Amino acid sequence: MEIQTAESNVICSIDIFESLSDSVDVAKKLVEKSQESNEAESTTDLRSIEAGFEGVVKQMGETLQSIPESTFDEEEYIGVVIQSLSNEMQNATIGDGSKSEMINNGQQKISAKHTPDIVSEQMEEDLYPTDPEFSYESYMMYSESQSQMTDIPDIPSKSTDVSRQRKHGNHSESQSLVTEIPDIPSQSTNVSSQRKHGNLSKSQSQSTEIPDIPSQSSNASSQRKYGNLSESLSMLPQVTQFMEPPYQAFICPLTKEIMEDPVTTETGVTCERQAVIEWFDSFGNSDEINCPVTGQKLTTELSANVVLKTIIQEWKVRNEAARIKVAHAALSLGGSESMVIDALRDLQMTCEGKEYNKVQVREAGIIQLLDRYLTYRSKDVRFELLKFLRTLADEETDDGKEMIVKTITMSCVIKLLGSSHQPVRHAAQALLLELSKSQHACEKIGTARGAILMLVTAKYNRELDSFASETSDQILRNLEKCPENIKQMAESGLLEPLLGHLAEGSEETQVAMAAYLVEIDIGHEKKTYVAEKACPALIGLVQSENIDARRAAFKALAHISLYHPNNKILVEVGIIKIMVEEMFTKRVFSDLMNSRNEAATILANILESGLEHETFEVNTHGHTLGSDYFVYNIIHMLKNSSPDDLNIDLIRILLSLSKSPRAMATIVSVIKETDASFAMIELINNPHDELGVGALKLLIALTPYIGHTLSERLCKTRGQPENLIQCPVEANQITEKHAVSAKLLAKLPHQNLTLNLALVNESIVSEILHAIHLIQRSGARTSRYATDFLEGLVGILVRFTTTLYEPQMMYLARNHDLTSVFVDLLMKTSSDEVQRLSATGLENLSSTTMTLSRPPQPRSTKFMGSLSMPRSFSLRSSKKKQIEICAIHRGVCSAKNTFCLVEANAITKLLACLQSDKVEVVESALAAICTLLDDKVEVEKSLSMLSEMNAVQLILNAVKEHKKESLLQKAFWMIDKFIIRGGDKYASEISQDRMLSGMLVSAFHRGDGNTRQMAENILRRLDKMPSFSTYIT
């Protein structure tokens, strides 16, 4: 039997769907036909199309009505909707095609919707008449004829069989109760058996003396709250009849509102207690008090009408439960905007101040229906929804709040904080304020994307919206219950909660806040403020015995110290002594958390900030950061194989101290005393790149003081120094270690023959030249360290030119044509240091040219003449080859073999360097040119060549531009050469430069010994000073 029923249901459903599908197809054809019509088409065709549409709609309505009742057992309210839609479709009419008539029909429908007759105010007549035309005597006669009505009327049953009504077609009002809506548990209790059996004689006898009170004078809000539904909700089919109208006996004759605490006077009139008391107070004399209804004299004695109060309360409970059902149906349907608004308002009035009704709303599943209305197109709907949600959340327990945050999409609520409609914006903030009182809700709000950022923004925009600012501030204070929210506030720019909990919270909270300080990115403008507020608390945690607290505090302090302006604050709170004690004093739990590493990091950050550290005391004995005590302990730790991370910070500390001459002298002294240079050189080979780079930088800083010692020990280290030259395949692969390694080799003393010989290797020099070519060719496609690497490589080549007396160095310079390499580098680089080094290399090479240049030797012919060979096989050419002699060096010269600057075309490039802004480049170029004016060469020829290249003016311009003593000495020496060896021509040109005369006078007055002597000589030769041939006594 069950199988047959299931099969029939399936067949029935298929028939229904097929029928609906056929109707839709017919409707589509009618639409196509209507679209094809034009203005010339006859009215008859239009009416036929309309009639076709009307038939299709009615057919679909009949099909919907045939859906079995069993389909909606679990969700009966859907059946109500389907039946309502079916009735409307069956009664649907379509106009006759006339545009004006259709408009009139539409206007009539709209006006019909707003007709007040549709929503009739109803009141039960069992206790008191509700019609003002119905007199009290008539009512008594009616009561006697209806003896069964003397008791309190029965509440309409909820068990009416609606399915039976549908089946038999009986749709009268008396039978159209809303049974399809799921029942909501009621708080009301059944009326006692005494009340059922007529034991209300006393209250009834008192009530019969009260004259008729017109129901239309009742307060409208009271009627709305406890009685009638709104117009839009009353339009719901088969729903409104479930509402129980208010009884006339419930209305207070004074306030015209439903009574909350009814009391009966001695005249038998029942009124609201507070209203009666106010009525009594309005009389000055108690003897003049009259009944407000009967006019009889009264005393102030009142008796509580407990039975009526109970009846009113139970009536309210029943109607409130019914209102919840009606609102559930309205929100489920998602009808018109007005219907949704009225449903939300009814729910709010029903739940306001009544915890039980809020529970009923939650259990009825209404909250689940509300989420979609957060994105409703109407701002009024969103406003009412937010108000209602706030009402649900406003309760003593957190159940309502938790259900809201679990069900409602919090991101939608957060978006409404930015609404352009101020009421919506304020309602959203009020809801969040109420929700934020719950711990669970605080977590959910914090996880909503952008929630805290928008609240922080609103808090700071007090000028734009003071209410939003104050409310957001309260919400944020509530959200502080969740530590993760505090972190988000700090990330959004609100740091006070984090700093406040760090300063005053429990130790566990302080640890969490300290960890957040490391994780968040604080703007530069607030880092100093954070340091001022956080450092005292962090110092306290550092001195705690809790390992987790100490670890978090050390990391936070290290993070704070990275911002250099903060370090002054750290020094003021006494961090130096605490960190030094952590580094030099053994503690039981120091090794457990590597506090030495953290302390060294903080000290290194402080020293790198550039503070004057020489006066910072490290202990109570007066030792400072630059003292032997501190430096010795640092180097001792570095020498004794400390962990790599600690060694990195120790090297950073020494590098910072090396910037002070006094501290540098101490470091050099301790290194020599402890022989720690070997340990530092060994660190170069460490696989940790950062440690290796740090060690190389420290060795570079020590080079001017113990360079030869470092060179000797570097050569004794396994794999060194050749391993320091590692040339990458591509220019963009150059690392910092490549650059500092080459720089160390370039900075070590150039005259150290041991190191130079260790570097003389055909493959090494070839790699250097290849790397230089690679960098020049790559242009902008290079690493950030490419320039430093290039400077180091050129410096290594220059060091080879300082020991050319060694045959291997001479062979290397000739074989690789270093002269041409340096000449090319003068112009093909943007680095001033490379230019300076290239000019220095040319100077070193050119200083040997005179020695290497030899006059051409006559070829011996004795041996060749003794050979008798045919004339055609003679080795002598028919024309002797002319050998050119260098006019300056008086011999055979070449750029490759004798390093002649003239043959290498280097003079013009060196003179161009005189126009550089860098004094070091100009000085090196002058030094290279000076080799052409040495007494061993043909000075006159050199002067003539330089004069043709405008060298005199370039030298004078360099003197005017730069004031360095060593540069002035070289420039004055060259000018003196031009005056002495060049004759009056050059002397006249030089003497006409007035600025030069002033500079010579200034150098004569304030220059050092050599510069002053040279200036004096030039002034004498220019007749600016008297020349004494004999001593005058």
UniProtKB/Swiss-Prot annotation:
- UniProt GO BP: protein ubiquitination
Q: Where is the composition biased (Polar residues)?
A: 200-226
User: Which domain of life does the UniProt lineage start with?
Assistant: Eukaryota
Q: What is its EC number?
A: 2.3.2.27
- InterPro entries (UniProt xref): ARM-like, ARM-type_fold, Armadillo, RING-Ubox_PUB, U-box_domain_protein, Ubox_domain, Znf_RING/FYVE/PHD
Q: Which SUPFAM superfamilies match?
A: ARM repeat, RING/U-box
Indicate yes or no for the key word Repeat: yes
- A single Pfam family it belongs to is U-box
Keywords associated with the record: Repeat, Transferase, Ubl conjugation pathway
Pathway involvement of the protein, from the record: Protein modification; protein ubiquitination
Q: Which reaction does it catalyse?
A: S-ubiquitinyl-[E2 ubiquitin-conjugating enzyme]-L-cysteine + [acceptor protein]-L-lysine = [E2 ubiquitin-conjugating enzyme]-L-cysteine + N(6)-ubiquitinyl-[acceptor protein]-L-lysine
Query: Can you name one GO molecular function term for this protein?
Result: ubiquitin-protein transferase activity
Check the record and name the CDD domains matching this protein.
Answer: RING-Ubox_PUB
| Ranges for region Disordered | 145-226
Q: Where are the annotated ARM repeats, by residue?
A: 483-522, 523-562, 564-608, 610-659, 665-704
User: What is the official name of this protein in its record?
Assistant: Putative U-box domain-containing protein 42
Please report the organism this UniProt entry assigns to the protein: Arabidopsis thaliana (Mouse-ear cress)
Q: Which gene encodes it?
A: PUB42
